Amino acid sequence: MALTLEELVKRFGGEIAGDAQCKVGGLAPLDQAGPQQLAFLANPKYLSQVESTRAGAVLIAPKDLEKLGAAAAGRNFIVTPNPYAYFARVAQMFIDLATPPRAAGVHPSATIDPAATVAATAVIGPHVTIEAGAVIEDGVQLDANVFVGRGTTIGAGSHFYPNASVYHGCKIGPRAIVHAGAVIGSDGFGFAPDFVGDGDARTGSWVKIPQVGGVTIGPDVEIGANTTIDRGAMADTVIEECVKIDNQVQIGHNCRIGAYTVIAGSAGIAGSTTIGRHCMIGGAAGIAGHVTLGDYVIITAKSGVSKSLPKAGIYTSAFPAVDHGEWNKSAALVRNLDKLRERIKALEAALAAQGGTHA
């Protein structure tokens, strides 16, 4: 379905520069878009691509349109302060228009306990299991093989993709998106040591600590494929409003993730850690347990966080990739730092004995 720029602006705002009746039926990158497609410029370093694009129209910020000057002549634009966010909303609209809603109802192969409550507007797919006391609210879509444990509530408009699981006693807020294979509410990693003796004479075992808390997830949260969020030991693990979590992220028991925080793939957050609002956690970052990150903290990819970081800012501990030979030289220097330090101390002592000075 194609829409005019005028129709888009009525829905999403912005101002038109060019032909308001230009029709677009999809989106594409600047260097690939055709006359029936809408492109966007989010990074001014690609401004030259706007001059050469074949796109029917371009989403652009006011300052970037000014930079184009005469090159903007004969082209069509929707001018908006945030072209990237505008693009995201238009993309979702086109997806919604192209995807007919699934009919409400329960697939014959689904297993629903008689003591569960399922809204008439919910879509329950093949082989879904819903245990006693669970509540599935209006407009929820549960795809094939989803498991919902006893006493769990799935908020209105949420969508669970195939093979996602949410254990018992969890609360999922409205409009959650939970991707395939994600697990919410599995046991936290809690074991009490019960050992006697030392060395080879040591006897005993680890005693499992029952995890009697749950998981509470706020509105508009998205959870990536194969991500795991452990239930609390006593109180709930909490994911606040509008948190976005990528694939294969591990969140330990009793964590609290503040609203609007984003966490990239393969990050690991150990138990009882609190992350503030509007934080950004890079891919494969590791955060130790029982620490607190303040609001607006950014942790770069592969960084390790071992202590609390209460102040907003960018933190990194990762070593960026370099040429292999250069890395080997650096590693050799690191291995010899203790020896070099001792040599420097010896030289300083010798200078001092001779009456010399050193910085």
UniProtKB/Swiss-Prot annotation:
<dbReference type="Pfam" id="PF14602">
    <property type="entry name" value="Hexapep_2"/>
</dbReference>
<keyword id="KW-0808">Transferase</keyword>
<dbReference type="InterPro" id="IPR001451">
    <property type="entry name" value="Hexapep"/>
</dbReference>
<dbReference type="GO" id="GO:0016410">
    <property type="term" value="F:N-acyltransferase activity"/>
</dbReference>
<dbReference type="Pfam" id="PF04613">
    <property type="entry name" value="LpxD"/>
</dbReference>
<keyword id="KW-0441">Lipid A biosynthesis</keyword>
<dbReference type="InterPro" id="IPR018357">
    <property type="entry name" value="Hexapep_transf_CS"/>
</dbReference>
<dbReference type="InterPro" id="IPR020573">
    <property type="entry name" value="UDP_GlcNAc_AcTrfase_non-rep"/>
</dbReference>
<comment type="pathway">
    <text>Bacterial outer membrane biogenesis; LPS lipid A biosynthesis.</text>
</comment>
<feature type="active site" description="Proton acceptor">
    <location>
        <position position="253"/>
    </location>
</feature>
<comment type="function">
    <text>Catalyzes the N-acylation of UDP-3-O-acylglucosamine using 3-hydroxyacyl-ACP as the acyl donor. Is involved in the biosynthesis of lipid A, a phosphorylated glycolipid that anchors the lipopolysaccharide to the outer membrane of the cell.</text>
</comment>
<keyword id="KW-0443">Lipid metabolism</keyword>
<comment type="subunit">
    <text>Homotrimer.</text>
</comment>
<dbReference type="InterPro" id="IPR007691">
    <property type="entry name" value="LpxD"/>
</dbReference>
<dbReference type="Pfam" id="PF00132">
    <property type="entry name" value="Hexapep"/>
</dbReference>
<keyword id="KW-0444">Lipid biosynthesis</keyword>
<dbReference type="GO" id="GO:0009245">
    <property type="term" value="P:lipid A biosynthetic process"/>
</dbReference>
<dbReference type="GO" id="GO:0016020">
    <property type="term" value="C:membrane"/>
</dbReference>
<protein>
    <recommendedName>
        <fullName>UDP-3-O-acylglucosamine N-acyltransferase</fullName>
        <ecNumber>2.3.1.191</ecNumber>
    </recommendedName>
</protein>
<dbReference type="InterPro" id="IPR011004">
    <property type="entry name" value="Trimer_LpxA-like_sf"/>
</dbReference>
<comment type="similarity">
    <text>Belongs to the transferase hexapeptide repeat family. LpxD subfamily.</text>
</comment>
<keyword id="KW-0012">Acyltransferase</keyword>
<keyword id="KW-0677">Repeat</keyword>
